[in-house]
Amino acid sequence: MKVVLLVCLVWMMAMMELVSCECWSQADCSDGHCCAGSSFSENCRPYGGDGEQCEPRNKYEVYSTGCPCEENLMCSVINRCQSA
């Protein structure tokens, strides 16, 4: 019984964390983050660092798999951040 309660508690904490990071637009995210994901599970994610997955910046600020790169980096044709 204790194990079941512990699992439920951990699950609830994980769900609360996911909900607290949800976003509807870029304005919902703090500096250094973008709103990315599918239309049902968008959340604030950090901008890509050197070698990390990225999506090119776009005028609509809509990203599905990842954020654009951090400043001074560019998103390559293979969707990885690299030096500009």
From Swiss-Prot:
SS bond partners: C23-C35, C29-C44, C34-C67, C54-C75, C69-C81
Signal peptide range: 1-21
Family designation: Belongs to the AVIT (prokineticin) family.
Any one GO CC term of the record: extracellular region
InterPro entries per record: Prokineticin_domain
Organism of provenance: Cyriopagopus hainanus (Chinese bird spider)
Keywords recorded for this protein, A-Z: Disulfide bond, Secreted, Signal, Toxin
GO molecular function ontology, one term from the record: toxin activity
Gene3D superfamilies given in the database record: Lipase, subunit A
Record flagged with keyword Disulfide bond: yes
Keyword Ribosomal protein listed: no
Annotated Pfam families: Prokineticin
Name recorded for this polypeptide: U8-theraphotoxin-Hhn1g
Expression sites by tissue: Expressed by the venom gland.
Annotated localization: Secreted
